[in-house]
Amino acid sequence: MGTKENTGARNTREALILAGLEELNEYGIQHFSTCRVAKACGMSCAAPYKHFKDSHEFIAEILGYINRLYDAEQTVLLEKCKHDSAREQLVQVSMHYIRFLTEHPAFRRIVMQSFQDCDEEYRVLRGQMSIKTYEVVSRYCEEVQMPPDVRKRKTFIVRAIIYSAALFFDNGELEYNEKNMEQVRGLLEREFDLP
């Protein structure tokens, strides 16, 4: 009987996290309402507090959910391209991130929200999505002996390409297809070719 209860609690917790994801997507962190999340799940306003200490822990768990999903996908990708050069791995990771953000628009909206007025824990959780990417970037920069100022500039440009492409695909400004993904790949590769 304990296993059924654990499974039920896990399912309820996951349902709350998924509804919370939609809540964050629509209202942002500053206007997050556990009561709206509970109602979206057909539960009482008190139900989320059986699974999360408070709304802070609830939001942190939603961000952790996004991190775990992306980390699992990125781990598979990096395993597939582990014998490629650091540059190719960086291009692959960048392309995958564009796909991830495009295919999960709610995640993109949450990841791209301003976290300036938020708790440090939220900023740290959002930053955890980039840990493996940062390792690949560091390896590539060491290989090509890239100076810090160039690394900073290129990081900004590559991030701008990634976020712009995901946004353009999501809002229909660019059709989300392989031809356009190849054009984006060309932009990324061109940036790595430039001094």
Predicted features and spans:
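Hydrophobic/aromatic-rich alpha-helical bundle segments in the mid-to-C-terminal region
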Residues: 109-112, 141-188
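Hydrophobic/aromatic residues within well-ordered alpha-helical segments
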Residues: 55, 62, 66-70, 93-97, ...
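Hydrophobic alpha-helical connector segments
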Residues: 61, 75-103, 148, 158
